[in-house]
């Protein structure tokens, strides 16, 4: 009974009757009043509603949620926090309200819609280069060291962060803060550190994307180990993967596959990597047309060089990203095919 009294259950039941009768305007006004009373009666300083990952919903649901928020945005002691990709939200609005943008318009009507709803916008900044290096190094430590060692490293980092929020906390800092009597093997971490400059340079500094990228890198290295590919260098694999991850240029990843496939695994680079560093740019006719953008020139000229490296095994472990029409068997090296046949023979004999 006390709960019914606090929540005004009878009044809410009467409101539902108004809705069934089609009197929605009265329902909305009365519901807001009752909601304000409920917030006051609870005694809280404020009620904060956090709506996360709204951009994962379909456009219709996004609009429905935004319209619901509009009803309560001016209710006393309430605040709504929306976590979402602004581009996806604007797209949903454009699908629901197909308004033609005029040439003289400075901003789109869809961003205007958001400005009227969102009173205090805050865009999460991308990680700085120092923050990226710190984050990636700590992720590598977490994946390759036991929990006890990692927790100690992380605690030291948190202490460092209290006094310095701008400098990077790299492997040298980590080692310097480890007691001398503790012998921690950082070989697995240091083996993968050459990937850090590439990841910092060519990914966009989004923590979620960085973690996802590293997870994919780990999976492919595991595939290489299972397949017996002992020549896979993490920095070479990373260089290929950052190109694959770029949605504007992932077709160039396919092009590299075709080029190396036609040349027994080795790209016909000649002096292309050096030309990419010059003001005149790429002159090689085979590469000039499709590889002359600033991004691709930076990618070609970045370390490590891919010249004279056999990339067959690299593309084999990345075959899930290839959209060619050739069967997977054509990507498998003779060594792996022989191993597969032996396994089949053993299975048949058993």
Q: Where do the PLM segments sit?
A:
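The feature marks long, low-complexity, polar/acidic/proline-rich intrinsically disordered regions embedded
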Residues: 1-11, 17, 21, 33, ...
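Short hinge/gating elements
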Residues: 16-17, 121
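Conserved Walker B catalytic segment
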Residues: 22-27, 33-87, 91, 96-98
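Glycine-rich, often proline-containing surface loops adjacent to acidic residues and nearby aromatics
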Residues: 44-50, 115-119, 192-197
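Residue-level signature of catalytic and energy-coupling elements of molecular machines
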Residues: 52, 122, 206
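Flexible phosphate/Mg2+-sensing switch loops adjacent to catalytic phosphate-binding sites
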Residues: 84, 92-111, 226-233
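Conserved P-loop NTPase catalytic core
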Residues: 101-138, 142
């Amino acid at each position: 009974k006390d709960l019914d009294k606090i929540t005004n259950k009878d009044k809410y039941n009467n409101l539902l009757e108004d809705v069934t009768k089609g009197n929605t305007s009265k329902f909305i006004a009365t519901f807001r009043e009752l909601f304000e009373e409920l917030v006051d009666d609870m005694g809280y300083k404020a009620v904060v509603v956090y709506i996360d990952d709204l951009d994962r919903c379909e456009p219709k649901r996004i609009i429905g949620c935004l319209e619901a928020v509009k009803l309560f945005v001016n209710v006393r002691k309430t605040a709504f926090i929306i976590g979402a990709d602004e581009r996806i939200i604007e797209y949903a609005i454009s699908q629901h309200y197909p308004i033609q943008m005029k040439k003289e318009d400075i901003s789109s009507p869809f961003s205007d819609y958001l400005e009227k709803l969102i009173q205090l916008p805050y865009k999460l900044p991308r990680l700085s280069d120092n923050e990226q290096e710190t984050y990636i190094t700590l992720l590598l430590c977490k994946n390759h060291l036991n929990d006890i060692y990692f927790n100690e490293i992380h605690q030291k980092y948190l202490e460092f962060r209290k006094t310095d929020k701008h400098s990077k906390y790299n492997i040298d800092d980590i080692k310097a803060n480890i007691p001398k009597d503790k012998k921690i093997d950082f070989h697995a971490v240091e083996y993968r550190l050459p990937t850090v400059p590439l990841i910092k340079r060519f990914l966009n500094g989004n923590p979620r994307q960085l973690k996802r990228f590293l997870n994919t890198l780990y999976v492919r290295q595991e595939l290489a180990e299972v397949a017996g590919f002992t020549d896979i260098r993490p920095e070479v694999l990373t260089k290929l993967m950052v190109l694959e991850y770029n949605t504007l240029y992932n077709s160039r990843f396919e092009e590299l596959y075709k080029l190396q496939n036609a040349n027994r695994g080795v790209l016909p680079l000649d002096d292309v990597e050096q030309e990419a560093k010059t003001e005149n740019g790429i002159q090689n006719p085979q590469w000039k047309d499709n590889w002359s953008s600033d991004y691709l020139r930076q990618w070609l000229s970045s370390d490590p060089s891919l010249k004279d490296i056999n990339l067959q095994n690299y593309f084999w472990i990345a075959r899930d990203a290839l959209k060619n029409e050739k069967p997977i068997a054509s990507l498998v090296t003779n060594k792996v095919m022989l191993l597969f046949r032996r396994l089949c023979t053993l299975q048949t004999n058993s």
